[in-house]
Swiss-Prot record:
Probably participates in efficiency of electron transfer from plastocyanin to P700 (or cytochrome c553 in algae and cyanobacteria). This plastocyanin-docking protein contributes to the specific association of plastocyanin to PSI. GO terms for biological process: photosynthesis. It comes from Zea mays (Maize). Residues 9-20 have a biased composition (Basic and acidic residues). This is Photosystem I reaction center subunit III.
Length: 20
């Protein structure tokens, strides 16, 4: 996920979801 598009908290959750 792109940090600029998502808030810090959601960024971590989205990053994991997208990677997996």
């Amino acid at each position: 996920a792109i940090a600029g598009l998502t808030p810090p908290k959601e960024s971590k959750a989205f990053a994991k979801x997208e990677k997996n």
